[in-house]
Swiss-Prot record:
GO terms for MF: ATP binding; serine-tRNA ligase activity
Organism: Bifidobacterium longum (strain DJO10A)
Name recorded for this polypeptide: Serine--tRNA ligase
Annotated L-serine binding sites: 231-233, 285, 384
Role description: Catalyzes the attachment of serine to tRNA(Ser). Is also able to aminoacylate tRNA(Sec) with serine, to form the misacylated tRNA L-seryl-tRNA(Sec), which will be further converted into selenocysteinyl-tRNA(Sec).
Gene Ontology, cellular component aspect: cytoplasm
Record's subcellular location: Cytoplasm
Catalysed reactions, as listed in the record: tRNA(Ser) + L-serine + ATP = L-seryl-tRNA(Ser) + AMP + diphosphate + H(+); tRNA(Sec) + L-serine + ATP = L-seryl-tRNA(Sec) + AMP + diphosphate + H(+)
Amino acid sequence: MLDIQFIREHTDIVKESQRKRGESVELVDEVLSSDTARREALKAFEEARAQQKEIGKKVASAPADEKAKLIAETKELSQKVSEYKSKADSAAEEYTTAMWKLSNIVEPEAPEGGEDDYVVVKKVGQIRDFAAEGFEPKDHLTLGTGVAGIDMRRGVKVGGSRFYFLRGQVARMQIAMLTMAVDQAEEHGFTLAITPTLVRPEVMRGTGFLNSHADEIYRLREPDDQYLVGTSEVALAGMHENEILDLGNGPLRYCGWSSCYRREAGAAGKDTSGIIRVHQFDKVEMFVYAKQEDSYKEHEHLLAMEQEMLAKVEVPYRIIDTAAGDLGSSAARKFDCEAWVPTQGRYRELTSTSNCTEYQARRLNIRERMEDGGTRPVSTLNGTLATTRWLVAIMENHQQKDGSIEIPQAMRAYMGGKEVIEPTKWEA
C-alpha cells in the first residue's frame, strides 16, 4: 500500500509509475476521488455525532416544555448519524479497495518496458565449449535419470503433471546446496527460520501476491481458508504483522527454508520436461526488515549474497535489471541472476532480489520505533539464495562425457567428500 499523503502531493509520480508498469493510470484518480469522498463522509458523520451528543447533554437539564422538542431532535439526529455512519463506512471500503489495487512506485532507475526489456548488468563466468571437449551436452533430465536421481514418471503418477521424485545423490545434492546457503546466510548475520507453508488470506494479501499473481497460488478453501506459499517471503513478511520493531541496531535479517508451491497457471507447453517449472520445490529465501533509508544498501547486499552463492556452485551467470512492466506489484526494483543452461543455449532465472520499500509493511502494519518516540513503516526486501531449479544449472554445467556429474568444490564437504555422481542402472 502507498502513502495517501504522497499520492495527494505527488500524483504525477504515481501515475508515471503506473504507466511504466503498464497498469491503470486512471486508478490513481479513482483513489483520489474515493479519498475525497471518504473524508467528506467521515466529516459529515463526526459533525452529526457531535451535534447529537451536544443536544443529548441539554436534555437532562432542559425545562419540561423544551424536553420533548430536544428528545425529538435527538431521535432525528440519531437516524442521521446512522445514515452518515453507513455512508462513511461504504466510502472507506471503496477507498481501501482502490488503494489496495495500486502497485508499488517503481524506482526511477528501473528500465521501461515488459518482460523482454530488461537490461543486462553484467555477465560472470566462462561458458563451456562442449564441442571442443568432443561431446554433445545432455539435458538435466537425461543426466538426472542416468544417475538415478530424478524420477519424473513416478512423480507424475503420484502427484500429476509437473511433479517429480528427487532420489539418491541428486536429492543429497539439493540438501547440500540448501544447507550451504543457510550456512552462508548465518555467516552474514541472518537468522534461520523454518517457516509455515500455509498462511492466512490476510498475510498473502498483505504481501501483494493476490494482485497480479493470484492465479499462481494454491488456495485451500474448505473447511479452512488458507493459501500455500510460493516462497517463504510470505510467511517471513507476516511474522511481524501488526508489530513495532526496534531497528536501532541494524536491519532484521532472516533466511527461511521451506517447501514452496506454485500452480504455474498459464505455463501450458512451457518447460514441460524436467524440474525447471514444477508445482513443488524447496527454497532458501532471504528476507530483511530495514529502515527506509537503508533499503537500497540492503538491496545491494542481497544481490552480493546471491552472487557469492552462485560462485560456490561454479556456473556461468548474468545479472539483469528487470523492466518495470515485469515487476511484481510489491517490488519497486528487482534484479535477477540467470544461469547459463547449455542444452537450451540461453540463460534461465535462478534467483531474484526485490526491494519492496514500505509497500508490504504498510499493508501488514509493520513499523519501527523512532528516536523521538514516533513510528513509521519499515522497508522490506527479499532474495533467493538457493532453490531446486539450481540443480538444472549445476548438473548441466558440471556434466562429464560419460554422463557423470562433477560436484562443485564448495559442495563436496556437504556430500561427505564425494566428488562425482556416477551413472547408475535402475528401472526408470
